[in-house]
Amino acid sequence: MKNKTRNIFFLVGLVFVVLMILTFKVSFRELWQQICHAGYWLVAIIGMWVPLYIMNTFTWRTILLGSGECNIPFWKLLKVTISGFALNYATPVGLMGGEPYKIMEIKPYVGVQRASSSTVLFAMMHIFSHFWYWITALVLYLIFMPVNMLMGILLSIVALFCIAGIYFFVKGYKNGMVVKLIRFVSRIPGCRKWGKKFSEKYADDLKKIDGQIADLHKQNKKYFFISFFLEYIGRILQSFEIFFMLMLFADQEPGVMLFVQSLIILAFTSLFANLLFFIPLQLGGREGGFAMVVSNLGMTIQVSMSISIISRVREIFWTSLGLLLMKVGNKNVEVPQHEEYTDS
């Protein structure tokens, strides 16, 4: 990727991070009190994302191996993964920031088609695992928590949403979804001319990318299930972030029930926040989700405020680090001649 292009991504991400910090409606005094209260637990909460990002990187590498050799150094893939998530967190419309950046960064190593298909597949797998994570939380809620009529209706809506999402992604894995996505964009007012021109110009490339997406599910099921397992387990392990915070702020003893509550809180908060994907850093959505879910579990509003503040501190840390990583370790890579992958 040219430094000029990389700098554009960096500046866009930086603008939204600064905007988020300036609109963070917490006084410095309260913020400092929460950080001091968290103490060494804050280090654990921030540090636990190292193995989570490593698992994300292994997922992406597994997907790349499903379509041929992967000659990208692991540290490079890890760096791009962290920076890609940072851009997704920082920019509006989520995936519109990180995914183009990731494609451009690994294109010199694997070619534009494999870079595009693997990045799309990684994004699909990341979202697909979320649907199963939300289903898991829903089942645990039904088993361990009291359910009244209103909550029953809400859980039914969530279940239908998740089932529809899983069905949509399974269809996408079988047949590819890039061509259909471009067609959908072409019907949006203001994007019709661009969508039509783009689909006509890159028709063959888009079909090949869809073919590579379908191949992972049809012909390389081992890589498909390994990548799904890594992402799903990553979502489960992420629940420990809330687990640590509940031990700290709610003064609860560690145990299975506390972990179940942590998983439910994170699942429904992430569902609520992802529905507001168009907001940079999901401003307000995540905090509202914490308040709604935590209060429904019988905890105080102060607990939800403390959790949301520390979560926001962690997000600012990793988003800032991801943006800084965009500026280091960027050596020019000689673009090789890439052969199209065919399964023999």
Regions found by a protein language model. Name each.
Residues 246-309:
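Membrane-interfacial helix-loop connectors
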Residues 214-269:
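Transmembrane helical segments that form the transport core of multi-pass membrane transport proteins
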Residues 5, 37-45, 214-229, 317:
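Membrane-interface helix starts
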Residues 29-35, 205-218:
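A short amphipathic helical element positioned immediately N-terminal to and/or at the very start
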Residues 45-53, 122, 222-234:
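Alpha-helical segments in transporter systems
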Residues 1-33, 87-193, 283-344:
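Transmembrane helix-loop-helix hairpins in multi-pass inner-membrane proteins
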Residues 57-82, 246-265:
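Membrane-embedded helical hairpins/re-entrant loop segments and their flanking transmembrane helices
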Residues 51-58, 62-65, 89-100, 275-288:
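Short helix-coil transition sites and intra-membrane helix breaks within transmembrane domains
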